[in-house]
Regions:
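Core catalytic region of metal-dependent phosphoesterases/phosphodiesterases
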Residues: 2-93
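Binuclear metal-dependent hydrolase catalytic cores centered on His/Asp/Glu-rich metal-binding motifs
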Residues: 6-9, 94-126
């Protein structure tokens, strides 16, 4: 991340420190996308392991820049212990359910295009 300027210096260490200060082993952490710069799942493993080594149960959702996120079964098989992928389904822990779906422009919204957006919108319905 250092390539983006001094603000990003030591970014991984700062994430670890802040995470450990705020998150305990029994906490649930939602990670709503843009998880890795990788283009392929194999290349994202190091980032997933980084997240997996941190405390808490982690729920990951695919972001619009998560190009590495391939078939859900492959992603789930690659996740370290304590990490779970949500994609048009839910995760339940301690009587709390969290649903995960890709957000998209809805019919009737400004900028919605029937030809460009309908198929994606319908695919992401839960």
């Amino acid at each position: 991340m250092d390539v983006f300027g001094s603000t990003w210096a030591n970014h991984p260490q700062r994430v670890i420190s802040a995470w450990r200060d705020a998150v305990g082993e029994n906490d649930l952490v939602l990670i709503p996308g843009d998880i890795s710069w990788a283009m392929r799942l194999d290349d994202a493993i190091c980032d997933l392991e980084f997240i997996g080594a941190l405390p808490g149960t982690k729920l990951l959702l695919r972001g619009n820049h998560d190009y590495w996120w391939s078939a859900l079964g492959k992603v789930r098989a690659a996740l370290p212990n304590g990490c779970f992928a949500l994609q048009n389904d839910c995760f339940t822990i301690d009587n709390i359910s969290v649903c995960g779906s890709r957000g998209w422009v809805c019919p009737g919204s400004s900028g919605y295009s029937e030809t460009k957006d309908r198929a994606i919108y319908e695919r992401e319905l839960i």
